[in-house]
Amino acid sequence: GGPVAPAGVEHDLWTTLAKTPAHYGLHATLKAPFELRSTSEGMLAALREACRKVAERHASWLTAPLRLQRLSVHSDERLASFLALVPRQGDAASESAMAALERDCVTELDRFRAPLDQRDVDRREPLSRDERRNLLRWGYHHVLDLFRFHITLTGPLPPERAAQVEAALNQYLEPVIDKPLAMDSVCLFCQTDRALPFRLTTRFALARTGNA
């Protein structure tokens, strides 16, 4: 059982590395998970409608070609790295479209978010001044100017195994490496309990056409 390890990575190691990403599902975050101000059906319906309106304001596009990259994360009070798929930099039009969509999701959906409790703030430390400002205002620290689109593939990597896992994933993902990603929809995921995996609720097509 469990996730299938790419060739060159032991099953037990891959099960550990895939545990956190599997909890969230294969995705790229545009608006970080948050608790609703109210769990009423009306609140959830209003959130769905707001998501639909955001999606309707944006046209679909292709990202720059994807590549595998190590990104940094604080884990157990130390700086660690994890692997993610990210678009190559330098495509101004694609980057502008991504930034606009992310900004819309962050700002327009924030009215549905319950305030963070102190535990949520504390678990993000250490933070820079800008990260703390974002966290307190928007519920997440890597947003707006600090946002970077990425598709998380692993949890924190053991330093002595990072190169091995990276090489194995590069080979496993050869069909998608150096290929663009079609950005044609956004999805709303829900979670009834923080211990349970996320569940896809609704998919919204990016529906803007023409210059409107």
Identify the residue ranges that each predicted region occupies.
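Small/polar glycine-rich anion-binding or flexible loop at a beta-alpha turn
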Residues: 182-190
